[in-house]
From Swiss-Prot:
Region (Required for oligomerization): 394-502
Pathways involved: Sulfur metabolism; hydrogen sulfide biosynthesis; sulfite from sulfate: step 1/3
Alphabetical list of InterPro entries matching this protein: ATP-Sase_PUA-like_dom, P-loop_NTPase, PUA-like_sf, Rossmann-like_a/b/a_fold, Sulf_adenylyltr_euk, Sulf_AdTrans/APS_kinase, Sulfurylase_cat_dom, Sulphate_adenylyltransferase
Species name: Kluyveromyces lactis (strain ATCC 8585 / CBS 2359 / DSM 70799 / NBRC 1267 / NRRL Y-1140 / WM37) (Yeast)
Gene that this polypeptide is encoded by: MET3
UniProt-recorded name of the protein: Sulfate adenylyltransferase
Length: 502
């Protein structure tokens, strides 16, 4: 088992356990300034406190931050590729000074740690965006930098009170110390870690087993359940899938543990960071995928990162990281032999292969199409269908232009109710109340068919606008105010979109 990055596991919770009561009393006294952490900051803090970000024992000061941005190294020379910073707004920053202690809160309530401020500095976000994430304005991390992150960063060391509170999957959230102890007790000295932010299917099971066999190792399935790419499948659905997949490995070969990481989708730099984290968790090998941690297409329609940038950068640090890189070998299904095989071992001109892309899978889930057993296990498909119902079971919101007759809402409701099918329908009277309008996505996700008027700013999945204005999803002629004509047009539109099946 490799040593933690930097030689020592910075388990701050264990280190500070003897003074937890004292720290908690100080934090709850009201004498210290407090900061309520964002979702990303909570993820970062948890991995500092539990040692997943070893050798870090706090948020980066300005010197370390600049060194990481410019050189992918801390000031002491250790490889570190992603800046871990505590961003705050200008008003809060103005209240801080060196050596001041501040309380870091979860949900503005639970004290997690006390930070002793080393410095407060204003980063050059343009340089960070370019050096760390290649600068494209469409990159999720660049968007976060300029649209969400505070203007100032606070550096400093941490004293741990407790890890963030999680109410889901407590048995699957292993800290680095816990995993290392389990690996040691089971004599797992060689462990290959598999990073994922997506559901797993048969191909993933096959490639991880092959990686383990070729390296004479065990398998750590280590999915991210913090923040991932916007639009990804929620972690609850994914964890239910992982719990089923883990049953499909030979007994004693694989272990599942959840990683509370806030991904930056930083491609090659992020892959190095992921390798360091897995090393801290006790893995000796790490599978680096094709376009690892890549966010897709940039503003010019080209992939943000090259397909092998991540593998090449991790490999270049191999001697310093003390973790073996296992290149992701894509496998494909051979229907004539009923087995999976690495695609680079197959002559595709002579051998028939089958595959289902991510886009095709989403289409089949949406349309209720078949997902064959060779692609995924029935239990996994069932979970995905529950969380991704087909169009006839999905909700929608129809937003009527304010110029349309109010009676149209009643006409649409009556028409929809006669079709049955189990979907609930509701006319939502909102009075431009933002709190009520904020509930629309929840209604839609629950499968409700909503009808509302005078909410032109409303946007989202399965939200359709009806009217004569340009940009309407269901355009109407200005002179057409015949309610029956409009109802028919709406019904045909919804049928075409798959919400109704006659």
């Amino acid at each position: 088992m490799p040593s933690p990055h930097g030689g020592v596991l910075q388990d701050l919770v264990a280190r500070d356990a003897s003074k937890k009561a004292e720290l908690l009393e100080i934090a709850q006294s009201g004498d210290l300034t407090s900061w309520s952490l964002t979702a990303r900051q909570i993820c970062d803090l948890e991995l500092i406190l539990n040692g997943g970000f070893s050798p870090l024992d706090g948020f980066l000061n300005q010197q370390d931050y600049q060194s990481v941005v410019e050189k992918s190294r801390l000031q002491n020379g250790l490889v570190w590729t992603i800046p871990i910073t505590l961003d705050v707004d200008a008003e809060f920053a103005s209240q801080l000074s060196p050596d001041q202690r501040i309380v870091l809160l979860q949900d503005n309530e639970f004290p997690l740690a006390i930070l002793t401020v080393s410095d407060v500095y204003q980063p050059d976000k343009a340089v960070e965006a370019k050096k760390v994430f290649r600068g494209d304005p469409e990159h999720p991390a660049v968007k976060y930098l300029f649209e969400q992150a505070g203007e100032f960063y606070v550096g400093g060391s941490l004293e741990a009170i407790q890890l963030p509170v999680h109410y889901d999957y407590p048995g699957w959230r292993k800290t680095p110390a816990q995993l290392r102890l389990e690996f040691e007790s089971k004599q797992w000295d060689r462990v290959v870690a598999f990073q994922t932010r997506n559901p797993m299917h048969r191909a993933h099971r096959e490639l991880t087993v092959r990686a383990a066999r070729s390296n004479n190792s065990k398998i750590l399935i280590h999915p991210v359940v913090g923040l991932t790419k916007p639009g990804d499948i929620d972690h609850h659905t994914r964890v239910r899938v992982y719990q089923e997949i883990i049953k499909r490995y030979p007994n004693g070969m694989a272990q599942l543990s959840l990683l509370p990481l806030a991904m930056r989708m930083g491609g090659d730099r992020e892959a190095v960071w992921h390798a360091i984290i897995r090393k801290n968790y006790g893995a000796s090998h790490f599978i680096v995928g094709r376009d690892h941690a890549g966010p897709g297409k940039n503003s010019k329609g080209v992939d943000f990162y090259g397909p092998y940038d991540a593998q090449e950068l991790v490999e270049s640090y191999k001697n310093e990281l003390d973790i073996e890189v296992v290149p992701f070998r894509m496998v494909t299904y051979l229907p004539d032999e009923d087995r999976y095989a690495p695609i680079d071992e197959i002559d595709t001109d002579k051998t028939r292969t089958l595959n289902i892309s991510g886009t095709e899978l989403r289409n089949r889930l949406r349309d209720g199409g078949e997902i064959p057993a060779w692609f995924s296990y029935p239990e996994v498909v069932k979970i995905l269908r529950e969380s991704n119902p087909s169009r006839p079971k999905q909700g929608f919101a129809l937003v009527l232009s304010e110029t349309l007759p109010a009676q149209l809402k009643t006409a649409l409701l009556s028409t929809f109710l006669q079709y049955g099918g189990g979907r609930h329908y509701k006319v939502l009277e909102h009075g431009n109340n933002e709190e009520i309008l904020a509930l629309v996505p929840d209604f839609v996700r629950s499968g409700t068919g909503l009808i509302l008027q005078n909410a032109s700013s409303l946007k989202g999945t399965n939200v359709f606008k009806i009217g004569e204005e340009s940009g309407s999803d269901i355009p109407l002629e200005t002179e057409d105010k015949n309610i029956l004509h409009i109802v028919q047009r709406v019904v045909l539109f919804l049928e075409d979109q798959g919400f109704f099946q006659f």
